[in-house]
A protein has these predicted regions:
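Glycine-centered recognition micro-motifs in short, flexible terminal segments and loops
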Residues: 1-10
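Long, compositionally biased, intrinsically disordered regions
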Residues: 12-141
Length: 141
């Protein structure tokens, strides 16, 4: 009876250690995914800033509805120095997916409507991010 009790206890101990280790790994994986999501959403403020930065360039190029912003890579070139590997992928996404929906010009202001859609699972772990960014920027004279 003591021997059976010992083996049952040993099996339960090994099982519980395996279970808690699996739970710990799942929590760490969830935290990694959360960090990646936070990183994408934190880019919204930066996108606002850089949208203003390219405002004049976009208007000067005469980009109309539905056209992609040409030369966005050069506008954000410094990203490569700050976050090398991540930046290259992000630049490619931005260059392909930031669209000028419309440009309205009147005597006293210019209105630039931007749309940015990111749909990617490039962060691994089967995570799919579907992120939309829409802004209407107004520059008054």
């Amino acid at each position: 009876a003591v021997l059976i009790f010992f083996f049952v206890s040993l099996i339960l101990l090994i099982g519980s250690l395996f279970y808690f280790n699996t739970q710990k790994n799942n929590v760490e994986k969830t935290l990694d995914i959360s960090d990646n999501i936070d990183r994408i959403y934190s880019k919204q403020t930066e996108l606002d800033y850089y949208s203003w930065k390219i405002f004049d360039k976009v208007v000067k190029q005469g980009i109309s509805k539905g056209e992609f912003v040409n030369g966005l890579r050069s506008e954000l070139e410094f990203y490569k120095d700050v976050e090398k590997g991540y930046a290259v992928r992000e630049l490619e996404f931005l260059e392909r997916q930031l669209v000028v929906e419309n440009v309205e010009v009147s005597d006293d202001k210019i209105v630039l409507k931007l749309n940015f859609n990111l749909y990617t699972d490039s962060f691994g772990e089967g995570l799919v991010i579907d992120y939309s960014y829409n802004r209407e920027l107004v520059k008054e004279f």
